[in-house]
Regions:
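A contiguous, mid-protein "functional segment" used to position or interact
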Residues: 75-111
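Residues at helix-coil transition
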Residues: 19, 51, 97-101
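C-terminal "lid/loop" region of Rossmann-like NAD(P)-dependent oxidoreductases
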Residues: 25-29, 37-43, 51-68, 73, ...
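Non-catalytic, hydrophobic alpha-helical segments
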Residues: 10, 14, 30, 42, ...
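Glycine/proline-rich active-site loop of Rossmann-fold NAD(P)-dependent oxidoreductases
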Residues: 7-11, 16-29, 34-35, 52-54
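Amphipathic alpha-helical segment in the mid-to-C-terminal domain
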Residues: 7, 35, 39, 69, ...
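Solvent-exposed alpha-helix faces
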Residues: 15-16, 44-47, 96-97
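Glycine-rich "substrate-gating" loop/helix at the edge of Rossmann-like oxidoreductase active sites
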Residues: 1-8, 32-35, 63, 67
């Protein structure tokens, strides 16, 4: 499970942090800690938003993969008035509309990996689709 952030929600905190010296060197989590979803749910939402009948392709787990990743945005709410304004479905819809308007760019699989060994996931090393 994960918490997914829409970029505009993050920027509403990051931009003011540049000007507030009291926030210098502080660690502040930004994210929608009220919406904790599975990757399967994200795939289902993407399928619905795009109008495609997408079926997930399951790969073996990556070594030491984090199963649940979330944060507490309490400090961001307190210091920066952080509020999640864009829920997951709206964020995916906005992102899909942006990509559809701009056009799909090919994915570059030729990025070299800094560390390549037996623990490197297959999906990082070879083209899957």
């Amino acid at each position: 499970k994960r918490c997914f952030s829409y970029i505009d929600d993050c920027l509403s905190c990051l931009i003011p942090m540049l000007d507030q010296k009291s926030l210098n060197k502080q660690i502040i989590n930004i994210g929608p800690d009220e919406e904790f979803v599975t990757i399967n749910k994200v795939a289902e939402i993407c399928s619905n938003v795009t109008g495609n009948n997408l079926k997930p392709i399951y790969k073996k787990d990556r070594p030491r993969e984090v199963k649940h990743a979330t944060c507490s945005a309490d400090k961001a709410r307190k210091l920066l008035n952080y509020k999640t304004k864009t829920d997951l479905i709206s964020g995916i819809t906005k992102t899909f509309d942006y990509i559809k308007g701009r056009g799909v760019r090919p994915f570059d699989y030729n990025i070299s990996l800094e560390i390549k060994n037996e623990l490197t996931p297959d999906t990082w090393m070879k083209k899957e689709l």
